[in-house]
Amino acid sequence: LHLPRRHRLSCARSHTGNAAEEIVMPVNRQFVLDSRPTGNVSPSNFRLVETPAPAPGAGQALVRHLYLSLDPYMRGRLNDSKSYAKPQEVGAVMGGGTVGEIVASNNPRFKPGDKVVGMGGWQDYALSDGRDLHVIDVTRIPIQAYLGPVGMPGVTAWYGLNKIIAPKAGETIVVSAATGAVGSVVGQLAKIAGAKTVGIAGGAEKCAYARAELGYDSCVDHKSPDFVAELKAALPEGVDGLFENVGGIPFATCMSRLNNFARVAVCGLIASYEGAPTALDNVGTLLITRSKIEGFIVGDHLALWPRALNELAGHIAKKRIRYRETIAEGLEKTPEAFIDMLKGRNFGKQLVKVV
């Protein structure tokens, strides 16, 4: 493998009767979970280690990562508690979505140079038997988009909107975290369906972007001291569909404005990931309005991924869906970028450019 010097380490190999021979091998930098956070995540919860990049065995391929995906669900996996996903093991490489390039392969499905999307985690290189890898076409769509609007976040948006909310033309759809990787796609798909869209985002800049670039009819700043009153004022006709990514006060306020037979898709509750959850004190609204509320995990619906990805790719190629990225430069910035994302400091999809 031909790599920059900063990605190399040396070791010695001896042969009988010959002098020691130096072999140059690539270094695999890895972030492992060093300790579980109590409260807010800290950089000290992660540890950077360096090991030789592994050689692929029978049926395996070696991937050099180009971009890492950072997503809110990762916070829940840091806790040693029951959830829909297995807790991240202490001492193990942090898991997560990746896009990269095949650099060596003993698997007939992949050849060196192939661009792939997978779940290689927070490291320079990863071995795979191919079950979690998919070759991607980067001629029409940028490679990092396969971690965003044409990846897990995009499919999450597609499923929650189409299969749970099922918007009708003229209905009012509310999206919290409206400019995030998932929310930004939800809002644009809802507009394509003919709905009126109301976004909730953090800060005047994000709300301006939601209206001007993502096409939201209105956007309410959850950092405003008058947020509750402003959100209610933005919903004079009530809420027909709610795509919930945040929880807390925004969720409770929207619940109080549900119309009859409204549909609520609960995708995430990031407001409670690092603290005590906010109690929902108006669940009676669900009965009064005969509304439906459904939590979902997009990984439960793999059979629908090809259809969703095909539709999303078409929208991206025709520029019907716009997206924005925050990219941290260098693997070493991963913990800091992860923490910034949890605090809402990112704009759009949070990525790490590895090389």
Residue ranges and their predicted role:
Residues 123-124, 202-210, 227, 277-283:
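Short, glycine/polar-rich helix-capping loops at beta-to-alpha or helix-loop-helix junctions
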Residues 147-225:
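Mid-domain Rossmann-like dinucleotide-binding core that forms the NAD(H)/NADP(H) cofactor-binding site
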Residues 94-101, 111-177:
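NAD(P)H dinucleotide-binding glycine-rich loop of Rossmann-like/cofactor-binding domains
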Residues 227-236:
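Short amphipathic alpha-helix with an adjacent loop that forms part of the alpha/beta core around
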Residues 249-321, 354-355:
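Glycine-rich phosphate-binding loop and adjacent beta-alpha segment
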Residues 26, 302-355:
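C-terminal hydrophobic helical "lid"/dimerization subdomain
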Residues 52-70, 78-122:
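Glycine-rich beta-strand-centered segment in the early N-terminal region that forms part
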Residues 2-24:
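Short, Lys/Arg-enriched N-terminal segments with co-localized hydrophobic residues
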